[in-house]
A protein has these predicted regions:
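Structural alpha/beta core scaffold segments of enzyme domains
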Residues: 1-270
Length: 270
């Protein structure tokens, strides 16, 4: 699910045949063929070491990432680059060092999809935090709470460079409050009781904790032009096309707020 950014032969052959035959052409790919020929993304090997002080505060993080690039690399090393600049997550990590190897193998090629390296990095970091909690005898939520970047430290510079060449800077956020709210809504403190009750009924349930920060807003960037038509209606022109995420509604609301006019008098053209 989710491969993108690639052109496959069938995407060219099917419409070409349809035009040549002047009739609909349908191509059906079975699951085995899909697994053998479609790009994938997740295959990485992580070796992570972490240093902490006596209070459970992170002192440093280091390790090695081996990224399976597949038989060839149509998208460069974007995915492992994102992975290594994501693994620190929302935590204060004073010292950081990772070596990354992108290896050619005999597997299908790797391209960015559905997280583009972030899920692997987050999994590696959060499993590390769980192991640390068990080793030190500290609650899993507490060890994370002690290391989350506080809101007063925002904007927070991670000291890393993202794949687009820009520094990794967390512009805002209240990570401690976010985790506290999640734990409260998930009734985390009451979970041992619920787990014991479920076990008595022959059911096995567990609970996990994970924090993540995702880099977004990559360039190039889009602007907007606002014009007032002779009819008095406002026309906002932008290259930000609607994708099912209410872009047009959001733009109309922002425009209406700034111009102090109802959004039904605003036309969005993209």
């Amino acid at each position: 699910f989710g491969p993108k950014g690639m052109s496959y032969p069938e995407e060219i052959v099917v419409p070409a045949l349809a035009r040549a035959l002047a009739r609909p052409v349908k191509w059906i790919e079975d699951r085995r063929e899909h697994f053998l020929t479609t790009t994938q993304e997740r295959d990485q090997i992580w070796d992570v070491s972490i240093a902490l002080d006596v209070d459970g505060k992170i002192l440093g993080l280091k390790g090695r990432l081996i990224h399976d690039a597949g038989a060839y690399v149509p998208w460069g090393i974007i995915t492992p680059y994102i992975s290594t600049t994501t693994i620190a997550g929302p935590y204060i990590v004073p010292a950081f060092k990772f070596d990354t190897t992108a290896a050619f193998t005999n597997k299908p090629p790797t391209t960015p999809l559905r997280g583009a390296g972030r899920p692997q990095a987050i999994f590696a970091m959060e499993r590390t935090m769980d192991l640390v909690a068990d080793k030190l005898g500290i609650d899993r939520a507490e060890i994370r709470q002690r290391n989350l970047i506080p809101t007063e430290a925002m904007p927070y510079e991670m000291g890393l460079i993202f794949r687009d060449g820009a520094p990794v800077i967390y512009d805002s956020g209240d990570y401690p409050k976010c985790q506290s709210m999640a734990l409260e809504r998930g009734e985390y403190r009451d979970f041992p009781r619920r787990q014991a009750a479920a076990r008595a009924e022959g059911r096995y349930i567990g609970i996990g904790i994970a924090n993540a920060v995702e880099g977004t807003g990559l360039g190039p960037f889009e602007g907007a032009t606002i014009k007032v038509a002779p009819s008095g209606r406002v026309v906002l022109q932008t290259g930000a096309a609607a994708q099912g995420q209410a872009h047009h509604t959001t733009l109309a609301q922002l425009c209406g707020q700034e111009l102090n006019i109802p959004i039904d008098r605003i036309d969005i053209v993209s």
